[in-house]
Amino acid sequence: MIDKIIILYFYGDMRMNRKRTPRVDTLEAVANVLRAYRELFEGNLIKALYYVDKALELEPDFYLALFLKGLALSAKGEIKEAITTFEELLSYESKNPITWVFVGQLYGMSGNCDEALKCYNKALGIENRFLSAFLLKTICLEFLGEYDELLKCYNEVLTYTPNFVPMWVKKAEILRKLGRYEDALLCLNRALELKPHDKNALYLKGVLLKRMGKFREALECFKKLIDELNVKWIDAIRHAVSLMLALDDLKDAERYINIGLEIRKDDVALWYFKGELYERLGKLDEALKCYEKVIELQPHYIKALLSKARIYERQGNIEAAIEYYNKAVENIHKDHGE
């Protein structure tokens, strides 16, 4: 036991008094990087930065140390410092597309999409099928409203990954924004050929068909979402109810309204639809209660004010009708219900 202690002390003394060489510095730098990696993995960012700085004192151009430092700084929220670190790394090694993507993300997080785009283009110039760079580039282009470039980017990605359903859906969404409904519909049909139960594709197809005036086809999309796939998105339910009312499908409309109100009891649109439904069924007192609920939730909702006025007029309550017609006129610039 004593012998072992002496040996350990001896080797410890040798380490303390060894002559420094480039090889020794490199090995020690590697050891510090490994320690930094472990601390970073465990979420100890301060310790990770300590070890990575120790490594960089020994090897200032140690690529992995700089990369880990950039990661740790970005995890701490020190975005500017992280960008500086990654750019220092790029001054030594500019051919790594992953580094360009990280810098691009940091510029994006700081709101500088123009610089982010430059970084993603650099990454794609090195690796032209780098999917992460493409996806991040599309986010920037959409944020900047550069839709023509965005569509080119989608098309390029789809030449490499033609079965990538989310990209077909995103392309359709942009085409819809541009008013190119038929082209958008082609993209959604392609997405649904590849994945018949894709929720986003079905929802967007329903929205698109509704905009195109194809109410029955649109309703089938929302019904499939809600009834077959059990997707209880409140927006999908609202769309379905509005289509049912337009198609005079009143029985199903009431069922869907109740599904929606179970999810969100204070949904203004659904309470308004319920009032409209009861009004059509001749249940005027029930309709008035629903419209009153709408006004309680959103006092400036003109359609509800007008609907109450209309019912009072039908019932011969002219004084109440005039009151609500006047309220509607007074609130015409305050309405948030349209």
Swiss-Prot record:
**Which parts are the TPR repeats?**
27-62, 63-96, 97-130, 131-164, 165-198, 199-232, 268-301, 302-335
Name by which UniProt lists this protein = TPR repeat-containing protein MJ0941
Name the species this protein comes from: Methanocaldococcus jannaschii (strain ATCC 43067 / DSM 2661 / JAL-1 / JCM 10045 / NBRC 100440) (Methanococcus jannaschii)
Database matches in InterPro entries: TPR-like_helical_dom_sf, TPR_rpt, Ycf3/AcsC/BcsC/TPR_MFPF
**Domain of life the protein comes from:** Archaea
Q: List the SUPFAM superfamilies.
A: TPR-like (SSF48452)
Record's keyword terms, sorted: Repeat, TPR repeat
